[in-house]
Amino acid sequence: MQTIKCVVVGDGAVGKTCLLISYTTNKFPSEYVPTVFDNYAVTVMIGGEPYTLGLFDTAGQEDYDRLRPLSYPQTDVFLVCFSVVSPSSFENVKEKWVPEITHHCQKTPFLLVGTQIDLRDEQSTLEKLAKNKQKPITLEQGEKLAKELKAVKYVECSALTQKGLKNVFDEAILAALEPPEPTKKRKCKFL
C-alpha cells in the first residue's frame, strides 16, 4: 500500500492538532495541549486503491524551530495553516512558514489552509479583533496569498463543525499524487 506523507505546519494555536484529530476521529478535542510532534495515519481509497495517509503534526512555537524540520524529509505535501481570525498567523505564512518549508523542501507541493472559519462571524471574536483595528481574513485574501506564494490551492475549514474538513485532505492527497513535472523530484530530500 502506497503511503502519502502530509506534514502540517503553522503558528501555535491556529488549530493544526484539532484539524488532524477532528479528521481522523470525527471528534473535536476539548482542550488545548501544545504539540511537540505527533503523527496519525488513516487509510483512504483513491480510484479503488488503498493509500495510507500519514499525517504529521508539528509544533508552531519558536522553541521548536530547530527540531521541526526533522519531520520534513520524504514529505509528499505540506498543509501550511493559519487561523482566519488571527491576522498575525496569516502574516507568518509569508514571513516564516513558506520560507521554512521551501528552504528544506524546495519542490514539495503545499496547500494554504485557513482554519477556524466557524469563528469568522462570532461576535466576541469580531470585537476582540476590532479592538486591535483588525478583521478576519477573507476567502479572497487567502486565495490571493496562495497564488502569490505558489501554493497548489487555498482551502478553508472548521475542525469544530467539520465544514470543509474532508476537502482539505482530499485536496492534499490530489496535490501529492499529481504527476510531477518530468525533470523534478517532488519529495522532500535533505542533502
Curated annotation (Swiss-Prot):
InterPro entries listed in its UniProt record: Cdc42, P-loop_NTPase, Small_GTP-bd, Small_GTPase, Small_GTPase_Rho
Q: List-wise, which residues carry Cysteine methyl ester?
A: C188
Instruction: Tell me where in or outside the cell this protein is found.
Output: Cell junction, Adherens junction; Cell membrane
As annotated in the record, motif Effector region runs over 32-40
Please list the GO biological process terms of this entry: ameboidal-type cell migration; anatomical structure morphogenesis; cellular process involved in reproduction in multicellular organism; developmental process involved in reproduction; hemocyte migration; maintenance of protein location; melanization defense response; positive regulation of cellular component organization
Which Pfam families has this protein been placed in? Ras
Taxonomy, superkingdom: Eukaryota
Q: Where is the lipid attached (S-geranylgeranyl cysteine)?
A: C188
**CDD domains in the record, alphabetically?**
Cdc42
One Gene Ontology cellular component annotation held by this UniProt entry: plasma membrane
So where does GTP get bound? 10-17, 57-61, 115-118
Q: What kind of membrane protein is this, topologically? A: Lipid-anchor
Q: Which UniProt keywords apply?
A: Cell junction, Cell membrane, Developmental protein, GTP-binding, Lipoprotein, Membrane, Methylation, Nucleotide-binding, Prenylation
Q: Which residues form the propeptide?
A: 189-191
Q: Which GO terms describe its molecular function?
A: GTP binding; GTPase activity
Q: Which family does it belong to?
A: Belongs to the small GTPase superfamily. Rho family. CDC42 subfamily.
What function does the entry list?
Regulates mbt kinase activity and is also required to recruit mbt to adherens junctions. Together with mbt, regulates photoreceptor cell morphogenesis.
Specify the protein name: Cdc42 homolog
Query: What gene does the UniProt entry assign to this protein?
Result: Cdc42
